[in-house]
A protein has these predicted regions:
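Mature N-terminal, pre-catalytic/accessory segment of carbohydrate-active enzymes
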Residues: 1-46
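Conserved, mostly hydrophobic/aromatic
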Residues: 22, 95, 135, 154, ...
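Noncatalytic carbohydrate-binding groove/subsite architecture in carbohydrate-active enzymes
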Residues: 32-33, 179-300, 310
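Substrate-binding cleft and catalytic face of glycoside hydrolase catalytic domains
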Residues: 44-241
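Aromatic/acidic polysaccharide-binding cleft in carbohydrate-active enzymes
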Residues: 273-368, 376
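Carbohydrate-binding surface patches
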Residues: 361-399, 403-410, 432-437
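Solvent-exposed beta-strand/loop surfaces of large extracellular or lumenal domains
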Residues: 405-422
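C-terminal beta-strand-rich structural cap/linker in extracellular carbohydrate-active enzymes
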Residues: 417-440
């Protein structure tokens, strides 16, 4: 049996924040597929993109990772001839053409192999820091036939508590969090201090830990306070089936920053996505179908709605075209269901002001509303693993409402007119997950 949810719009309450960042962007691999991919990416109005695991999305191309920009470790890091920026230049240029700002992740792509090849902790942190400084010079100061792109945000490594992303040859270095304490902290100190000394206007941050562990993040901040290492933003990754978990993490991280003496540092969610049913069976068909289903779309829409009122500065979804983790199914040149949720949220960011909402409380349902410059109203309703509902929208003066519905059966567009009671009635999903965008 369906329950009824009444939705009424109230007074203006600020702006809808475009916090829907993403990991990775349209690929350089196939020129023939690029126009459609760029169009799909541009439609989402992505405010900022960071690039982690980019070589996975650009197979056969050496790009983004520090070991791919500077491939021969024993070479002279001050000689521009020892760098190859070309694939990364082209890759970033596409993202910029699509209107996205860039955060540069200085690090490596994950390695699931038995032996690690690129994620070993740099043997000389000072040299690695100098290499990173030259990367900044290339993109911000024109060094080595480079650019003046003013890339402001630079994150140092990714999940340094994950042995698949930061390893060391000596097992004695493997402490309670892998090599996080024994290797990463010193690396962060070397890189962050050099970058801020040479480029005082950029922002540096880390550590992008697996989850918002207060122990790990607290350890990181304590180390930075003791060593006077700069922290302009604090970041972590989160894969969960509970949207409220992300909200709790954001609040905890903000509180930790303030209590640790970094009140001006921003809060960045470096990676987030609906978590798999089971990490040990990640690649079985059932998991793939779940990760790329309407559940992922409803989850994403709900997270972006809930975070509107939370102290997070950017939330980078993982990712753009990385298989069933992504928004774009590259082999078939078509979007996954979650792309449609991002498109609905992107349409919400066109609103010139946010509107308060009065709504019948319902588990798994969130509502975001706004008004565009011409006066039309927009309402995004996210139903994540919720019961069946009938929505009744109170929209005085509206003659009709256009609906875009993302459900288990796909995406549909239709119009509804007022019922005899003057309200707009919309029968929602029969239970499960869905997302709806209403426009007057």
């Amino acid at each position: 049996m369906s329950s009824t949810i009444d939705i009424s719009l109230g007074a203006p309450c600020g702006a809808i924040r475009a916090i829907h960042g993403i990991n990775n962007s349209p690929s350089i691999v196939e020129a023939a597929a690029l126009p459609a991919e760029k169009e799909a990416f541009r439609a989402l109005r992505i405010p900022r993109v960071r690039h982690h695991d980019a070589p996975i999305e650009n197979s056969r191309y050496e790009l983004v990772d520090v070991s791919r920009l500077f491939p021969l470790w024993r070479a002279d890091e001050n000689d521009p001839a020892n760098y190859d920026f070309r694939p990364t230049d082209d890759y970033f240029a596409i993202a910029r053409e699509c209107g996205a700002d860039i955060e540069f992740r200085l690090g490596e792509t994950i390695e699931h192999s038995t032996r690690r090849y690129r994620v070993m902790a740099p043997e000389d942190p000072a040299k690695w820091a100098r290499i990173c400084a030259n990367v900044v010079r290339h993109y911000n100061e024109g060094w080595a036939d480079g650019y003046h792109w003013n890339i402001r945000r630079w994150s140092i490594w990714e999940e340094p508590d994950n042995i698949r992303l930061l390893d060391a040859p000596d097992e004695d270095d493997h402490g309670r969090w892998g090599v996080f304490e024994s290797r990463y902290l010193a690396l962060y100190e070397a890189v962050s201090k050099l970058l801020k000394r040479e480029f005082p206007d950029i922002l540096v941050g880390g550590p992008q830990t697996m989850g918002a562990s207060m122990d790990k993040l607290g350890c990181f901040l304590s180390f930075c306070k003791e060593t006077d290492s700069p922290v302009d933003f604090l970041a972590w990754t989160c894969y969960t089936g509970d949207p409220e978990q992300i909200v709790r993490d954001v609040r905890a991280v903000r509180t930790l920053l303030d209590g640790s003496g970094f009140p001006k540092a921003d809060v960045h969610l470096a990676e987030w996505h609906l978590g798999p049913k089971c990490w040990n069976t990640l690649h079985v068909p059932e998991n793939r179908e779940y990760m790329s289903s309407v559940h992922s779309g409803a989850f994403a829409a709900q997270v972006l709605t809930l975070l509107q009122d939370e102290p997070v500065d950017m939330a980078y979804f993982y990712g753009w075209g990385i298989g069933y983790w992504g928004l774009w199914e590259r082999p078939f040149r078509r979007p996954y269901p979650v792309w449609h949720a991002f498109k609905a949220f992107a349409d919400m960011t066109e609103c010139t002001r946010r509107l308060s909402v009065e709504c019948t409380p319902a588990e798994g349902v969130s509502v975001l509303a706004g008004e565009i410059a011409e006066g039309g109203k927009r309402i995004l309703v996210s139903c994540y693993k919720s019961a069946a509902h009938v929505f009744k929208l109170r929209l005085p003066g509206a003659a009709k409402v256009s609906v875009t519905a993302l459900t288990e059966t796909g995406v549909s567009n239709y119009e509804i007119e007022p019922s005899p009671d003057g309200l707009f009635h919309c029968t929602g999903n029969d239970g499960g997950s869905a997302a709806y965008l209403f426009r007057t």
